[in-house]
Amino acid sequence: MVKSDIEIAQAAEELPITDVAAKLGLTSQDLEPYGYDKAKVNWQAIKRSEENGHLGKLILVTSISPTPAGEGKSTMTIGIGDAINNQLGKKTVIALREPSMGPVFGMKGGAAGGGYAQVIPMEDINLHFTGDMHALTSAIDNLSALVDNYIYQGNELGLDPEKIVIKRGLDVNDRTLRKVTIGQGSKFNGVERPASFQLTVGHELMAILCLSKDIADLKERIGKVLVGYTYEDEPVFVKDLGFQGAIAALLSTALKPNLVQTLEHTPAFVHGGPFANIAHGNNSILSTNLALHLSDYVLSEAGFGSDLGGQKFLDFVSTKLEKKPDAAVVVATVRALKYQAEKSTDHLKEENLDSLKEGFANLDRHMNNVRSYNIPVLVVINKFPTDTEAELDLLKSLIEEQGFPCEIVTAHDEGSKGAKAAAEKIVELADKSDYEIKRSYDLDDDLETKIEKVAKRIYHAADVEYTDKAKDQLVKLKKMGKDKLPVIIAKTQYSFTDNVKELGAPTGFTLHVKGLSLRNGAGFVVVSTGHILDMPGLPKHPAALDIDVDETGKISGLF
């Protein structure tokens, strides 16, 4: 009988977290333990690492457009990282985002890898972990409560209740909270106004946590967060209300990177979790930077496909990290590419070379998008049991015909042994890497130019169309002097377009911009397209229905 992911994780022989830390030259004095198998790294160790003069190679892991069939990007990141560390004997750290509990109990499930390529303790990482998500949710909702109290207690600056732009947050998928009215009833209950909730991972405070370099930077960024506008339409920021210290205090511990291990005891930093469709989609700057100072190779996974997390890492995050990736991995699967052609999961287990050829257009777009940055690229095929030799041979030949190296990886079933060839190739590419990155846009471009360049170069759109609301917001941002900030485009993860049903590699379409939101503390503008939601709902059969716990406290059903 095939073991489930959680059964494999629960049967693992974990090392004490102090032993995992020792692999990186960290002592028990450098850690703030959360039990036996996880810890935060303290500021003393972080500052010492920054002074050691060492900087490892950075490998970005991205993928094709996600599908219900699953791509296994986290599994590939962990498997290849394990192989570099254990098969090649090179000091390696894996850097991943923290899972959000919303998808864990919803449709997507967890984000700790799969099979014999997982980070552990799997249940903790997918649920409460070290409490970072709870700290963020508390900070988000305390900020909103303080703002509403400010209005209730006199509102000296004349903050217009109808122009509050910050939202409340929850780490729960709950569609009923997308639009609410607060303060109903008597004046004793506060000022009545419309409000909204968004998923914690999509809130600006999550982005700030992932971009801050230390507590001083964290506090400064929180102070810059736009709260709303006055009755005279003047912007009001958190620092104008004096709340930045309290909110930073709530996040000061969450800012420290979390250290765990893989099933094969490779060190892993799992820290920060912004979604790539509604935010910037990459783990924290602090954890990646720490990993680079403590190891020779760092694998960092970007959310969703190369058009989302990958593009945002290369155009934005790497500028804040002040390091470009030395190489990139693009993950693909036979069954996901067949889905791009068939648009159904009904027959994905059956051999279909024609569907694979047609669906290859999606991978072709993604791998060429990444190569357009001049970065060396390895394409890996995550092999599934239903893949036929004919399908694997065809896909590998299609990839190599485009001039890309390709390796088939079986880490899900075999652990690091199944990723050795991919590890050897990506290390070779990273070691030889010497290129000048060609980003999608120049930082000096205005917002419209940045949006157009990403839309045309990465999505292959023909045109960009703005609603009247979006046009007004562009004017306001220019008036505020914020029209040169980087852009984070919020778009469906399932398509290069803003239409979830347009699969494959469409061209000649129009990207529809519905609105622009200033994330002043994070230092970017979110560009909303199509019908993207920042508070998901639950499916008809949520994953929660399959999760249980027995009388000993042993959890089952997580994946």
From Swiss-Prot:
Q: What is this protein called?
A: Formate--tetrahydrofolate ligase
* UniProt key word Plastid: no
Q: What domain of life does the native source organism fall in?
A: Bacteria
Which SUPFAM superfamilies is this protein grouped with?
P-loop containing nucleoside triphosphate hydrolases
Which reaction is recorded as catalysed by this protein? (6S)-5,6,7,8-tetrahydrofolate + formate + ATP = (6R)-10-formyltetrahydrofolate + ADP + phosphate
The protein's matches in InterPro entries, at most eight in alphabetical order, are given as: Formate_THF_ligase, Formate_THF_ligase_CS, P-loop_NTPase
Q: Which NCBIfam families match?
A: PRK13505.1
Mind giving the lineage of the organism this protein is from? Bacteria, Bacillati, Bacillota, Bacilli, Lactobacillales
Q: Please tell me which top-level EC class this enzyme sits in.
A: ligase
GO MF, any single term: ATP binding
